[in-house]
């Protein structure tokens, strides 16, 4: 009897945790969708030139170990 009660409480607790997590992640999906549309709307020429720092605007070529766009040791 005690084991049955413990199992029922555990199942209810895990179900409540999953429902709470689903509520929290629902808002993040909206932001992810917005982020993906802004990436798609970016023009292919919207990139940093060689020698610029790798950061918010992606490098046209690649980012090297020193954190700069262009040739050299790549990450």
Curated annotation (Swiss-Prot):
Tissue: Expressed by the venom duct.
Family matches, as Pfam families: Conotoxin
Modified residues (Cysteine amide): 69
Single GO cellular component term: extracellular region
Prodomain residues: 23-42, 70-75
Signal peptide from the UniProt entry: 1-22
Subcellular location: Secreted
Keyword set includes 4Fe-4S: no
Domain comment (free text): The presence of a 'disulfide through disulfide knot' structurally defines this protein as a knottin. The cysteine framework is VI/VII (C-C-CC-C-C).
Family membership noted in the UniProt record: Belongs to the conotoxin O1 superfamily.
Stated name of the protein: Conotoxin Leo-O3
Species: Conus leopardus
